[in-house]
Regions:
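ATP/NTP-dependent adenylation/nucleotidyl-transfer catalytic domains that generate, transfer
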Residues: 1-201
Length: 201
């Protein structure tokens, strides 16, 4: 069953309530995240009312760099893609469609986006997921250093940016829903780093 709930009035109400507090500031991801949190609230209300579990949709790549909204798209009781990198999600989707076409092709071929702002795509602020997932595998699963990763041909600037994002978003991952483990070093119980004191390895 597919249903649509219009969230415009709810998002507008939040923004109106925050107008005085946000005076003399420019719109940024704060306002964008309100949309995700409104959706999360509605999904959890439906879950509560009908005794169903909400599935969190975040994958390992997004969880690694914090491309998820706490109490928004991270809400849910189980995260089936939690340990699956984005590039593998695409491959699994394409494979599933060889059995029967249930995933719209546009979902697989369009540029990935959080869809919280017009014309927004993930690659505005991230490298391609092919690059990101390779860095992620080397840093998290193989436990390579920044120097070892750059020796594989990756830009030092990009590697520093991605590894820094991974470390800074430990606090988000601690609050994420549980999910299956398929890798040699999954986020959660296996890989836990400090969240405070400006920790740097």
């Amino acid at each position: 069953q597919f249903s649509n709930i219009d969230i415009h009035s709810m998002v507008d109400s939040f923004n109106l309530s925050l107008n005085d507090f946000f005076e003399n500031t420019s719109p940024d991801s704060t306002e964008e995240n309100i949309q995700a949190r409104v959706r999360g609230t509605l999904l959890m209300a439906l879950s509560n009312k009908y005794h169903k579990i909400v599935l969190a949709t975040g994958n390992k790549s997004e969880m690694a760099v914090g491309y998820a909204t706490l109490y928004g798209d991270m809400c849910g009781g189980f995260a089936p893609l939690k340990d699956i990198p984005k590039t593998m999600v695409y491959r699994l989707s394409s494979y599933r469609n060889t059995i029967s076409q249930i995933i719209p092709e546009r979902v697989i071929t369009r540029p990935p986006s959080a869809e919280l702002a017009p014309n927004q795509v993930d690659q505005d602020t991230l490298p391609s997921y092919d690059v990101l997932d390779d860095i992620l595998k080397r840093f998290v699963e193989l436990k390579h250093s920044v120097a070892q990763i750059t020796e594989q041909g990756h830009s030092l600037e990009v590697v520093n940016k991605i590894t820094s994002m991974i470390l800074k978003n430990e606090y988000k991952r601690r609050q994420s829903a549980p999910g299956p483990k398929i890798s040699g070093n999954a986020f959660g119980k296996e890989r836990r780093y400090p969240m405070t004191s400006k920790f740097k390895p």
